[in-house]
Regions:
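Bacterial N-terminal signal peptides
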Residues: 5-16
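Residues in and immediately flanking transmembrane alpha helices
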Residues: 15-16, 63, 86, 92
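A broad, low-specificity signal marking well-ordered, structured residues that form hydrophobic/aromatic
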Residues: 18, 23, 93
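Early extracytoplasmic/lumenal segment of secretory-pathway proteins
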Residues: 21-85
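Glycine-rich, phosphate-binding/catalytic loops in enzymes
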Residues: 42-43, 88-94
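A structural signal for short loop-to-beta-strand junctions that line the ligand-binding cleft
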Residues: 70-75, 93-118
Length: 118
């Protein structure tokens, strides 16, 4: 996937938050490239990205325990198996956008999650 496509995809995710002044990303990933994408997003939109980092199990447990009061807007993991299992629990909402639909092959997305890579 080209870098521009990934940036557009990340923007597509985040722009679903409308006029939000900030977005909370719960991330089990620890890559410098992720931080660079968040910084580019903030520079382009003015929306602050708050990153809450942790291990998959701990982040998922927190999201489940907080329920509807969860501060998580986006959950990112490097483990597709955990992603699928979390989706099966009904923990995600529909995130399909026209940008995602056109940029991401069907086998790397569902209506509730999308796989990304750099």
């Amino acid at each position: 996937m080209k870098k521009i496509t990934l940036i557009a995809l990340i923007l597509a995710f985040f722009t679903t938050f409308g006029n939000a002044a900030e977005v909370n990303v719960f991330s089990a990933r620890h890559y410098d490239s992720d931080i660079q994408l968040y910084e580019k997003f903030t520079a382009k939109t003015g929306i602050k990205v708050n990153v809450i980092s942790g291990k998959d199990k701990a982040l998922q447990k927190r999201i489940v325990e907080e329920g509807a009061d969860s501060k998580a807007d986006i959950y990112i993991t490097a483990d597709a198996g955990r992603l699928g299992a979390f989706d099966a629990k009904g923990m995600f909402q529909n995130s399909m956008t026209p940008v995602i639909k056109s940029a991401v092959p069907k086998n790397f997305r569902s209506t509730n999650w999308t796989g990304i890579a750099k």
